């Protein structure tokens, strides 16, 4: 039995269902050994004795007999030097029994380069048959198409390659500088070499072609004999993204007589072929060409002529058609320096003479418009005349070569004699396609400018109009530089600035920068002056050794495109630069947009002296037109005198100035400018007057072409009155227009700054309040002046939505314009408290009043025009809405039905929409005060009659309906009132139109006798007090609404739902717009905010002390008050979301407000005491009300007690102005926050999103619990 190490089925389980029995048979091995040692007869004899069938076909027997290699005998010369039994044993003393895992011989390298594929776009397989179905291409056609479409690399693995058509395609691809790797079968490679010899192709001189051979696995016999197999893999790999694999071989017979199949794989399956090709190439051996392939050829054009298509129009001697002559005594080979080898150089070159060997980076095509040329009589000998002119040609794409022509040519001769090693590329230096695509200069003109050339991918190509008349065509008889109409060129060339950009990246490239040997050429860029700025090289030593430092000029006021984009982007992040990242000179230059260096202009005499040795003929009027620079736009040869040197030289007639003087002036000035496109219009020939600067379209004009909402000019937006007026005084109109252009241009390039990101910093809030101390004690006259200035500015704003949208852009732009420049020119909004009340009349004449308080703390918003215009909108809205409401109430004060309630609510919203439009035109302050005064007088006339009607109706309702309605009806009506009060708020003045309780009516009536300034502050404080201390009007009105809903419940329910849906969007929009106020009302806001914060904290603290009592009074009216508290909290915090971090910054805000508003609070207390002393409660109203409450129910009595508590405690509470009271207040607020009684911003976000999607009942359940508890406790008292 065999040992375990000798078992071929080691590790396999015979009981496994997937077990595959081994197919190895011992007599196979013995029969092969007999065949290898003694021949076919011994093989057949062994099979006959063994009784086994023949397992080899005759072809296999013949192959083994033909390819068998026997081991060398001792003392006998090895007949197989390339076999595994070479003389290596004697050299290194290694034993034949030692088999290392890794070879110490380096694997061959893919020296022409190999692309790296990082990802695939899916997998696609296409099956090809031969012969093909009808209307389908053959496999050979697909092979040729794939080779022609190659851009990076071509890899072929083939057993037999004898198809000349495919070889012609491969040579064409190699001539396009695409690496071509061919791996052939080692035994059949001679067939490929014979085909190359037949068509006169010398494979040693095809630069981008590598041919290697691979054999099959080696079989080792018992006595040391070996034989190898064939390479039967067949596939074509193109760009590592496409593979054609199958049974098709590159032979004539496979195209004509054999049936075959092939598959085209695209996608991820190509990676396996990629790996297999690199493995085969690493195991391959070099191809040994035959002597016939290296034989000299007598006829030049015998090679590949029938297969290369039509002959070119000029002698394009292919370098692989000329054998190398081994004649070291001759300086140059007889076939000379091939122009194609000169022209098609490697994409990146590391040697020092790359510019000399790459003359101009392209073939200089030109056209002699005057002399006809015979294209068929050109020869390579005539082309060699250009060698003496190479120093005068433009340099290649990169710097770093010898400027001395003699030394460079001597170095070039040495390289040519040294096996052309300088033309070998490294493995990492493959380029997609470097075959130039040329365009006829007589065709359609391409767009000028650097950016258009970059987009078109034609930056390095030159056209005929860019060649000047420096080199007369008579120096090259019989040709106009080169033939213009050559063979058809292939597209896909992506030129680069230089090899330095490819290796080091484009971020280190400087447009127009200097190389290692002086100023770099800008010849590959188009210029509007139609004259190439490339400095032509003279043969004098003065030019080669001129002072390079004298040419260097610092560029201070101009930057490259990349630097400008970087600074423009950084200006959106760093706001410490003046003009959005552009360095602005202190004094504006007269020609700031000119491409002239700021320091000094180059004198024309210096330029003439420097280039006086140039072989340039002076200009004469009789010169032929084709010798002048060709202007493609105007067809005028003389219209090129628009050089920037005219701005700095005396007015000399252009006829008296030589052409090379003007050209040198142009070149010296444009040479040192980073922007190669001068913004000047062409001057008329013969005039030397400095041309005016071409007006550039402003940024707004450019944006208006591509955007729906163009940005209005910046002057329309002015930050505040002072800022806009002072800026207009400081800057003249020209500077102001320039300034606006800079701002708008930078703003169009960078991303808009999100105002929501720059929020919520405690330090920022404290700094804002500390800076606002300087502005708190401004006089009333200054405030009125600011308001008037702002009014005049706001009149320029359009009345459509575009003006409102772009005002936010103006706010963002204004942030970056010196906030710290002038403290008086900016207004910092500190805080704002807004009280809105909406009143509606019920069927019985009872007033529905729902108040909401929006507490806003704006931390870091610098006011622009929007703040003043918004204040004016509010004041006008109050006056118009209150007067309209009072007129409506006067008409329908006795017989208002439920339908009238809905009509009136819609009227309120209509007034808000109508009054919003006129408010943008900017009404003056006297108009606002006059309207407000008229509305107050009309209200006082109607109030006396209205109070009696309301009292009688209320008494009748309470006597008639004493039963408590069900909980569902209460929730429905309360949610409706909450929706009206929350979503459609009116300004505070409108609450005077419909008072319900006697105490509230008298308080508001007496408040109208005050002056204007204390009046607004008093109304503000009254609204806050009434909402924070006791929401009695809401609860009493909700009680009356229960009785009303009982009579007409269905109609009221439908109407409320329609109101809620209709008013939702407008209320949110109004709440968001109500953001800031001006500096004139800062003291009033401080006082009202102080009242709000203390009252809020007190009611929240009271709610925590009396939690156990709130459950008992839940059946009376907690659902109603919950709705009102919800509306109050949601409206206030929804605005706070966009303005401040209330939870983090309230302590700092309250400290600053309380410290700054001591004087105002003292004045408010005095005014409140005066009002309380002069106020006369109406006994006729209070008595019937108390009587009704005593006879009707305990709920009404509780409401009456609450109302009396409101009247007693409204103005009697002393102002806690001592530091101890403030400390107690702050401690309470901190304790409440620790118990999470205050909504955070994130909770408000969630609640705001969930409110519209739930029913009314769910909205009531989600309301805050602070106000209901407080109300319940007050009612129980």
From Swiss-Prot:
Chain intervals with Polar residues compositional bias: 1-12, 777-805, 971-982, 993-1015, 1112-1130
Ranges in coiled-coil conformation: none
Highest taxon in the source lineage: Eukaryota
Amino acid composition bias (Low complexity), ranges on this chain: 1204-1215
Keywords linked to the UniProt accession: Cytoplasm, Cytoskeleton
KW Cytoplasm (keyword) present: yes
Cell location: Cytoplasm, Cytoskeleton
Main localization (coarse): cytoplasm
Annotated signal peptide: none
SUPFAM superfamilies: Phospholipase D/nuclease (SSF56024)
InterPro entries linked to this entry: FAM83 (IPR050944), PLDc_FAM83H_N (IPR041996), SACK1 (IPR012461)
Disordered: annotated span: 1-20, 67-98, 717-756, 772-805, 971-1018, 1070-1130, 1158-1225, 1247-1266
Pfam families assigned: SACK1 (PF07894)
Basic and acidic residues: compositionally biased ranges: 724-750, 1247-1263
Bridged cysteine pairs (disulfide): none
Purpose: May play a role in keratin cytoskeleton disassembly.
Family in the record: Belongs to the FAM83 family.
Name listed for the protein in its UniProt record: Protein FAM83H
Source species taxonomy: Eukaryota, Metazoa, Chordata, Craniata, Vertebrata
């Amino acid at each position: 039995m065999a040992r375990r190490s000798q078992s071929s089925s080691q590790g396999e389980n015979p009981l496994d269902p997937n077990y595959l029995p081994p197919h190895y048979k011992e007599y196979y091995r013995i029969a092969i050994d007999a065949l290898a040692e003694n021949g076919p007869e011994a093989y057949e004899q062994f099979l006959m004795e063994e009784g086994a069938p023949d397992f080899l076909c005759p072809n296999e027997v013949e192959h083994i007999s033909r390819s068998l290699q026997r081991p060398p005998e001792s003392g006998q010369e090895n007949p197989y030097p390339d076999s595994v039994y070479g003389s290596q044993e004697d050299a290194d003393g290694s034993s034949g029994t030692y088999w290392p895992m890794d070879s110490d011989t380096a694997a061959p390298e893919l020296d022409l380069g190999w692309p790296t594929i990082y990802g695939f776009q899916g997998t696609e397989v296409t099956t090809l048959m031969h012969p093909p179905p009808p209307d389908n291409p053959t496999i050979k056609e697909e092979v040729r198409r794939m080779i022609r479409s190659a851009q990076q690399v071509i890899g072929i693995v083939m057993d037999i390659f004898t198809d000349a058509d495919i070889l012609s395609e491969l040579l064409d691809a190699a001539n396009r500088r695409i690496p071509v790797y061919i791996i052939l079968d080692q035994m059949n490679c001679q067939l490929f070499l014979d085909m190359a010899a037949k068509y006169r192709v010398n494979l040693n001189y095809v630069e981008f072609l590598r041919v290697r051979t691979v054999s099959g696995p080696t079989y080792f016999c018992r006595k040391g004999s070996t034989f190898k197999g064939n390479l039967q893999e067949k596939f074509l790999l193109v760009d590592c993204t496409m593979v054609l694999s199958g049974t098709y071989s590159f032979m004539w017979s496979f195209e004509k007589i054999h049936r075959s199949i092939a598959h085209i794989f695209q996608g991820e399956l190509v990676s396996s072929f990629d790996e297999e090709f690199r493995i085969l190439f690493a195991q391959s051996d070099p191809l040994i060409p035959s002597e016939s392939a290296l034989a000299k050829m007598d006829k030049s054009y015998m090679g590949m002529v029938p297969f290369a298509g039509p002959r070119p129009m000029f002698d394009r001697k292919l370098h692989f058609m000329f054998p190398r002559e081994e004649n070291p005594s001759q300086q140059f080979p007889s076939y000379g320096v091939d122009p194609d080898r000169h022209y098609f150089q490697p994409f990146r070159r590391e040697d020092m003479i790359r510019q000399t060997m790459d003359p101009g980076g392209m073939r200089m095509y030109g056209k002699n418009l005057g002399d006809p040329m015979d294209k068929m009589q050109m020869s390579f000998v005539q082309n060699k005349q250009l060698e003496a002119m190479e120093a005068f040609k433009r340099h290649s794409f990169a710097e770093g070569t010898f400027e001395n022509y003699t030394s460079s040519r001597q170095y070039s001769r040495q390289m040519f004699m040294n096996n052309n090693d300088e033309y070998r590329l490294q493995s990492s230096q493959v380029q997609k396609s470097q075959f130039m695509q040329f365009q006829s200069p007589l065709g359609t003109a391409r767009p000028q400018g650097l950016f258009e050339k970059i987009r078109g991918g034609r930056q390095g190509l030159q056209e005929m109009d860019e060649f000047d008349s420096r080199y007369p065509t008579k120096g090259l008889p019989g040709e106009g530089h080169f033939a213009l109409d050559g063979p058809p060129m292939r597209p896909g060339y992506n030129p680069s600035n230089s090899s330095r950009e490819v290796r080091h990246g484009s971020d280190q490239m400087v447009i127009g920068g200097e190389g290692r040997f002086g100023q770099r050429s800008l010849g590959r860029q188009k210029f509007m002056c139609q004259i190439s700025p490339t400095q032509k090289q003279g043969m004098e030593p003065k030019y080669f050794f001129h002072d390079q430092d004298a040419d260097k000029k610092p560029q201070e006021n101009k930057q490259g495109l990349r630097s400008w984009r970087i600074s423009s982007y950084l200006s959106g992040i760093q706001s410490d630069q003046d003009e959005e990242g552009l360095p602005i000179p202190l004094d504006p230059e007269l020609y700031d947009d000119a491409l002239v260096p700021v320091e000094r202009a180059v004198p024309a005499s210096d330029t003439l002296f420097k280039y006086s040795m140039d072989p340039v003929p002076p200009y004469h009027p009789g010169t032929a037109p084709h010798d002048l620079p060709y202007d493609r736009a105007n067809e005028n040869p003389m219209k090129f005198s628009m050089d920037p040197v005219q701005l700095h030289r005396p007015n000399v007639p252009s006829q008296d100035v030589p052409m090379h003087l003007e050209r040198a002036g142009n070149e010296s000035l444009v040479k040192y400018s980073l922007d190669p496109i001068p913004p000047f219009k062409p001057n008329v020939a013969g005039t030397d007057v400095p041309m005016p600067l071409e007006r550039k379209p402003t940024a707004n004009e450019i944006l208006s072409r591509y955007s729906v909402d163009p940005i209005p000019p910046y002057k329309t937006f002015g930050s505040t009155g002072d800022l806009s007026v002072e800026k207009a005084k400081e800057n003249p109109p020209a500077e102001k227009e320039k300034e606006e252009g800079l701002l708008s241009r930078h703003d169009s390039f960078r991303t808009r700054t999100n105002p929501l990101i720059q929020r919520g910093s405690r330090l920022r809030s404290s700094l804002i309040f500390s800076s606002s101390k300087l502005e708190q004690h401004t006089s009333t006259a200054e405030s009125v002046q600011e308001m008037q200035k702002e009014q005049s500015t706001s009149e320029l704003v359009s009345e459509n939505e575009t003006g409102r949208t772009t005002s936010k852009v103006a706010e963002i732009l204004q942030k970056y314009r010196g906030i710290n420049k002038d403290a008086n020119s900016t207004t910092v909004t500190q805080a704002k408290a807004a009280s809105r009340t909406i009143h509606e009349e019920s069927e019985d004449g009872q007033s529905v009043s729902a108040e909401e308080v929006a507490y806003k703390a704006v931390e870091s918003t610098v006011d622009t025009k929007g703040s003043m215009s918004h204040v004016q909108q509010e004041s006008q809205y109050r006056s118009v809405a209150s007067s309209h409401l009072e007129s409506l109430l006067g008409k329908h004060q006795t017989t208002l039905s439920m339908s009238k309630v809905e009509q009136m609510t819609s009227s309120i919203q209509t007034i808000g929409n109508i009054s919003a439009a006129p408010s943008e035109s900017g009404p003056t302050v006297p108009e606002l005060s006059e309207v407000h005064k008229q509305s107050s007088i009309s209200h006082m006339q109607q109030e006396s009659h209205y109070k009696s009607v309301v009292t009688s109706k209320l008494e009748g309702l309470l006597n008639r309906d004493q039963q408590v309605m069900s909980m569902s009806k209460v929730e429905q009506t309360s949610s409706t009132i909450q929706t009206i009060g929350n979503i459609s708020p009116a300004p505070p003045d409108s609450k005077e139109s419909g008072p319900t309780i006697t105490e509230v009516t008298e308080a508001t009536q007496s408040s109208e006798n005050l002056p204007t300034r204390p009046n607004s502050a008093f109304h503000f404080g009254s609204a806050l007090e009434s909402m924070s201390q006791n929401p009695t009007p809401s609860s009493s009105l909700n009680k009356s609404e229960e009785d009303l809903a009982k009579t007409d419940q269905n109609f009221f329910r439908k109407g409320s739902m329609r109101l809620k849906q209709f008013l939702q969007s407008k209320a949110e929009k109004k709440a968001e717009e109500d953001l800031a106020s001006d500096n004139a009302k800062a003291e009033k806001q401080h006082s009202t905010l102080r009242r709000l914060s203390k009252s809020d904290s007190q009611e929240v603290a009271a709610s925590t002390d009396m939690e156990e009592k709130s459950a008992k009074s839940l059946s009376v009216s907690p659902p109603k008050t919950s709705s009102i508290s919800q509306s109050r909290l949601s409206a206030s915090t929804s605005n706070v979301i966009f303005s401040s971090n209330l939870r983090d910054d309230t302590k700092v805000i309250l400290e600053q407000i309380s410290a700054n508003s001591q004087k105002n609070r003292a004045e408010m207390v005095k005014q409140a005491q005066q009002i309380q002393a002069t106020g006369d409660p109406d006994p006729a109203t209070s008595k019937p009300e108390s009587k009704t409450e005593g006879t009707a129910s305990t709920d009404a009595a509780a409401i009456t007690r609450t109302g009396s508590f409101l009247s007693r405690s409204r103005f009697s509470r002393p102002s806690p102005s001592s530091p101890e009271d403030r400390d107690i207040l702050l401690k309470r607020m901190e304790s409440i926050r620790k118990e999470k009684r205050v909504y955070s911003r994130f909770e408000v976000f969630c609640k705001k999103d969930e409110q519209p999607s739930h029913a009314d009942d769910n909205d009531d359940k989600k309301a805050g619990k602070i106000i209901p508890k407080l109300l319940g406790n007050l009612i129980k008292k």
